[in-house]
Amino acid sequence: NGKTDPGCRVRVNCHAVPGVWQYEALAFKPGLVMRWFRDGFCQLEKQQAEATGKDPYYLMDKEAAKVPAGCYGMMCTFSDVMNFISWKHASPTFTNFELDPEKFSRYTFYRAILENTAMVTKGHLELVKEATGNMPQEIVFAGGAAKSPLWCQIVADVLGLPVKVPVVKEATALGAAILAGY
């Protein structure tokens, strides 16, 4: 049986496989925020990507990797550890930055978004551990996140856990196919 979290901080879902439970902590905005940032502030990268056949996120990551961890003290809050019953989200903010374009370029802001998602992931894992007594030994990134070595590394550094990326990065279709044959 799946143990529920009385505080409703972790959602417990039955799995498609009988007797298996999924503990889920929710962070709704990371992918949406990254798309918003790309579309709103990285037109140059989108144009370069179109011209070179590269993904714009690859180009953004390449530059954001040059920004030191911690983003010169700037913090981003777009997603937060949340209680899924209340569906409340943090107000989107960037704080503690200066008007120094050498340090605080769009890539610093982008990296701060990546770091925010890593901190939210850490908070969610701590909630799952409180609810279940278990902590994963590794993290598996799939979907869009799996395409970013920088994001994988930031999450690995924040969690102190290895982040693995499967060969098949689009896990939804693969999972559906596996379950269809189950």
Report the location of each language-model feature.
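Short, well-structured alpha-helical segments that form the helix of a local strand-helix-strand
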Residues: 52-68
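Glycine-rich phosphate-binding loop of actin/hexokinase-like ATP-binding domains
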Residues: 1-54, 70-98, 104, 165-168
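Generic recognition of flexible, low-complexity loop/linker segments
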Residues: 11, 23, 62-65, 127-128
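Alpha-helical scaffold segments in soluble metabolic enzymes
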Residues: 32-40, 127, 154, 175, ...
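Residue-level preference for well-ordered alpha-helical positions
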Residues: 38-39, 45, 49, 129, ...
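Gly/Ser/Thr-rich beta-alpha loop segments that engage phosphate groups in nucleotides
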Residues: 4, 21, 145-146, 177
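Activation-segment/catalytic-loop signature of the eukaryotic protein kinase fold
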Residues: 66-174
